[in-house]
């Protein structure tokens, strides 16, 4: 099948995370099907190094993610850990940080707006 794509999660090629128009230190991604050109739809794997923090942003559409490795903490103190599936509704605002690093499978439906 020419329209099938298989991604080997153990052998990804990560690039600096620049989804907000600037490179965010300590964050990198491997785009699977995600594209800003198609309205921010698709999937990517996000890698955050120890001590990394995402920019404060608002979700214009749903964002869902599955924690593959490590832990991620939101400003309210909620910790997402390996095996957690998290959903953010449109209009939600947050930033996240990781103490020891993490790997996250992200499903996007809309472009996040930096705040």
Indicate where each model-derived feature is located.
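Conserved short histidine dyad/triad with adjacent acidic residue
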Residues: 28-59, 89-93
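Ligand-binding loop in jelly-roll beta-barrel domains
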Residues: 90-115
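Glycine- and acidic-residue-biased ligand/ion/polar-headgroup-sensing regions
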Residues: 50, 59-75
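Short acidic-glycine-tyrosine-enriched beta hairpin
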Residues: 74-93
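Short beta-strand segments in beta-sandwich/barrel cores
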Residues: 53-54, 70-74, 85, 112
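A short, N-terminal "cap"/entry segment at the start of jelly-roll beta-barrel domains
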Residues: 1-40
């Amino acid at each position: 099948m020419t329209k099938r794509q298989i991604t080997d999660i153990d052998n990804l090629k990560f690039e600096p995370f620049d989804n907000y128009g600037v490179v965010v230190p300590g964050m990198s991604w491997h785009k699977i099907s995600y594209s800003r050109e198609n309205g921010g739809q698709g999937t990517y794997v996000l890698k955050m190094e120890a001590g990394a923090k995402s920019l404060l942003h608002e979700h214009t559409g749903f964002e869902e993610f599955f924690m593959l490795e490590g832990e991620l903490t939101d400003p309210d103190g909620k910790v997402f850990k390996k095996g957690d599936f998290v959903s953010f509704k449109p209009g939600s605002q947050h930033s996240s940080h990781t103490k020891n690093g993490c790997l996250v499978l992200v499903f996007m439906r809309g472009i996040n707006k930096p705040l």
